[in-house]
């Protein structure tokens, strides 16, 4: 008999789930979490709990928590680890923030949704004790360069096509579980947060004269799957670079925007009164392409801009790529044809949501339609 009850009404969550936890006392059996997991993400109902050894399948996307109106299903908090790091005088705390946070945090303090509050966000992190605050957009630029370069290399050398983006850990987990045959098609590029964390414990540490053993790298972002990503065994590039396993994982702690808001409230900071501050330099600069990462289709658009430059040697003209309307918007599946100069034409697609991804990939198996790049 399964230890998970009422799975016809709610999502089963393992006690050791690194991203999501479930307070059953708050659960009203409203089925919203279940519908999000089964109907929107196509995870629940797409495996047999008994056949899987009574171990729930989870891609850590957090859609169940987003759907729960009672705070029964929520992200696993790591604020205690953050506070412990800040209280340790031996530690240097470096916090990176994803682009979405600066326009989402205001809702927790009475601002209109979408209000741009980068300065206050950085100022709040400094007031909370961060030694350095850096912008994940720098890591996004690294992702763009690697992903676009890899795509061009595959096209030139006859590599596995289509190339899928790989910077979303929930999508990577989804592919590992349900479409393992497509793993060779995934880009080797890590998420922008993971790449920047590795840079913090290597390049940043060297330039600032900091022992990487003393760095605690923290990420603030809207994604619960990033919590699980920090614990994947391959997420230790800095330790491998230094040939020293004691450096640990690249990202030590990942907290969500909601956790960040709660942290500010717990410390009784007056967010409205916080003075604006700026990101630290060195890895605090970014291009405009990195900022659109937070949009559905943004990774595709940014990668196409860079691929154009790699293929032609020139910046794309304004009419060519800077307004890729076809891959923007909230439709579940979007397709476009991209011209990279005179000689290269790419078929691309943007898919969001697990159910849309499952349907798209199953259709792709059947119809064999050609794509070069898929986000």
Regions found by a protein language model. Give the residues of each.
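Short low-complexity stretches enriched in small and charged residues
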Residues: 48-60, 116-121, 173
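Iron-sulfur-associated redox domains of electron-transfer enzymes in respiratory
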Residues: 75-375
């Amino acid at each position: 008999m399964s230890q998970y009850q009422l799975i016809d009404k709610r999502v089963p969550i393992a006690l050791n789930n690194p991203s999501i936890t479930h307070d059953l006392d708050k659960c009203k059996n409203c089925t919203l979490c279940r519908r999000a997991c089964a109907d929107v993400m196509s995870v629940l109902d797409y495996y047999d709990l008994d056949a899987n050894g009574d171990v729930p399948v989870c891609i850590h996307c957090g859609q169940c928590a987003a759907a729960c109106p009672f705070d029964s299903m929520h992200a696993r908090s790591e604020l205690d680890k953050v506070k412990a790091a800040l209280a340790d005088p031996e530690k240097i705390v470096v916090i990176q923030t994803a682009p979405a946070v600066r326009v989402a945090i205001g809702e927790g303090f009475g601002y209109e949704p979408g209000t741009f509050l980068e300065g206050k966000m950085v100022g709040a992190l400094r007031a909370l004790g961060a030694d350095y605050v850096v912008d994940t957009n720098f890591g996004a630029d690294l992702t763009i360069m690697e992903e676009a370069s890899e795509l061009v290399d595959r096209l030139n050398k006859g590599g596995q096509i289509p190339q899928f983006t790989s910077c979303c850990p929930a999508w990577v987990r989804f592919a590992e579980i349900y479409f393992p045959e497509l793993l060779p098609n995934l880009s080797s590029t890590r998420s922008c947060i993971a790449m920047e964390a590795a840079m913090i414990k290597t390049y940043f540490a060297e330039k600032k004269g900091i022992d990487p053993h003393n760095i605690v790298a923290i990420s603030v972002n809207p994604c619960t799957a990033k919590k699980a990503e920090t614990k994947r065994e391959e997420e230790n590039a800095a330790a491998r670079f230094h040939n020293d396993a004691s450096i640990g994982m690249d990202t030590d702690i990942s907290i969500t925007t909601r956790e960040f808001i709660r942290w500010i409230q717990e410390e009784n900071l007056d967010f409205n009164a916080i003075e604006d501050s700026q990101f630290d330099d060195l890895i605090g600069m970014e291009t405009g392409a990195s900022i659109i990462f937070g949009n559905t289709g943004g990774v595709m658009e940014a990668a196409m801009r860079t691929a154009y430059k790699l293929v032609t040697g020139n910046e794309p003209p304004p009419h060519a790529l800077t307004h890729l309307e076809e891959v923007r918007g909230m439709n579940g599946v979007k397709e476009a044809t991209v011209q990279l100069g005179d000689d290269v034409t790419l078929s691309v697609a943007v898919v969001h949501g697990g159910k849309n991804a499952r349907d798209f990939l199953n259709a792709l198996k059947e119809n064999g339609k050609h794509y070069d790049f898929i986000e």
